[in-house]
């Protein structure tokens, strides 16, 4: 279309380049895991810390952000780590800004939970709950029951201050889950996914399956789960290790997508190199997922899962001007690389 170009506009020569919406990373820890012993996204003092928020752990000056900008990632959903069974509240941030307040575009996005070896390893080694998968399920269910009771007492008080239960920020956050204002974002692999599905059904709460290695064993259960917001798969480059990491079935993305599940691909950065996200997406193409569908798993799908598709994830009038230019076609060409990243209409990286 011939559009009027204002005098102040920057003209970008993009002949031969591939333009697409800014990449949305649906599961990340950027800005919160620094060098050495810095674990600001893991409050490992209690097995359940629903009151804490990832927002307060993010260092806007972290070197993670220039790295992900160079990779074409314009928005990250930043979650607490998986040391605790209930890790805290999740937020979404743009990759550029002078402060976390300026960068954050949604808080909260979800409440982080974790199953399996991570919380078992943290607390079992201290001879504390949870030492087993039984214990993990008990921690989640008991906290949901407490929050349900708290909510019922609030409703019964009918606004009378003297009848209200003592204020509890953690329970308030879990009540957001029970009211289905936000989903739980669950670190889980293999049969731990079935625990997530059972608990979500029991309490009628929305959820995402994060990592989801081994999903190919449970297609029918996952695809029929009524409150599933999406599957956030990856990182796909993880080694085939014993136990939970033993089945990195990237081919499941084609089946889940074809059967109507909203799928996204994560970096888990900075734990895994965020620059590898496009290469990981290429693995999904190699193993059978159509290229156009894989690009959606990097853009509009994670935006939908985070409840941000009104702002990001596609190039449409009225949405944020988050655009990336690639030399080569990402997830299709091995040599494809990001050569320009635009966030909120401003070029923040150019090769």
What is each stretch, according to the model?
Residues 1-20:
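Histidine-rich, glycine-flanked metal-binding segment
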Residues 15-80, 84-91:
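Metal-associated gating/positioning segment near the N- to mid-region
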Residues 1-6, 328-331, 346:
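N-terminal metal-binding scaffold of metallo-dependent hydrolase/deaminase domains
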Residues 9-13, 110, 341:
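Conserved beta-strand scaffold positions in the cores of enzyme catalytic domains, especially
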Residues 64, 69-207:
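Polyanionic/metal-chelating signatures
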Residues 53-54, 151, 157-249, 264, ...:
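Active-site core of metal-dependent hydrolases
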Residues 35-36, 40-52, 228, 234-237, ...:
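His/Asp/Glu-enriched, well-ordered alpha-helical/loop segment
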Residues 30-33, 83-87, 191-194, 214-219, ...:
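Active-site environment of divalent metal-dependent phosphoester hydrolases
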């Amino acid at each position: 279309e011939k559009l009027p170009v204002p005098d102040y506009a920057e003209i970008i020569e993009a002949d031969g380049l591939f333009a697409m919406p800014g990449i949305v990373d649906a599961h990340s820890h950027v800005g919160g895991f620094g060098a050495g012993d810095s674990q600001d996204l893991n409050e490992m003092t209690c097995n359940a810390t629903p009151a804490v928020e990832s927002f307060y752990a993010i260092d806007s000056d972290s070197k993670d952000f220039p790295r992900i900008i160079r990779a074409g990632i314009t928005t990250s959903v930043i979650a607490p780590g998986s040391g605790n069974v209930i890790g805290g509240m999740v937020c979404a941030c743009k990759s550029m800004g002078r402060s976390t307040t300026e960068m954050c575009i949604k808080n909260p996005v979800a409440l982080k939970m974790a199953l399996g070896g991570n919380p078992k390893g943290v607390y079992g080694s201290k001879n504390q709950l949870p030492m087993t998968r039984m214990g993990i399920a008990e921690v989640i269910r008991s906290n949901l029951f407490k929050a349900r009771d708290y909510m019922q007492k609030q409703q019964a008080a009918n606004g009378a201050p003297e009848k209200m239960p003592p204020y509890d920020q953690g329970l308030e956050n879990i009540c957001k889950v029970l009211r289905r204002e936000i989903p739980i974002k669950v670190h889980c692999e293999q049969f731990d996914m079935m625990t997530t599905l059972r608990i979500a059904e029991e309490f009628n709460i929305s959820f995402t399956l994060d990592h989801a290695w081994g999903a190919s064993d449970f297609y029918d259960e996952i695809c029929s789960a009524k409150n599933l917001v999406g599957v956030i798969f990856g990182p796909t480059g993880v080694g085939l290790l014993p136990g939970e990491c033993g089945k990195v079935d990237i081919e499941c993305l084609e089946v889940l997508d074809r059967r109507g599940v909203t799928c996204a691909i994560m970096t888990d950065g900075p734990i895994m190199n965020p620059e590898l996200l496009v290469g990981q997406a290429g693995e999904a193409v190699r193993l059978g997922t159509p290229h156009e569908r894989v690009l959606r798993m990097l853009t509009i799908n994670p935006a939908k899962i985070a409840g941000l598709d009104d702002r990001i994830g596609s190039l449409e009038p009225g949405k944020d001007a988050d655009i990336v230019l690639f030399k080569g076609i990402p997830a299709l060409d091995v040599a494809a690389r990001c050569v320009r990243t635009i966030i909120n209409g401003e070029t923040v990286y150019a090769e």
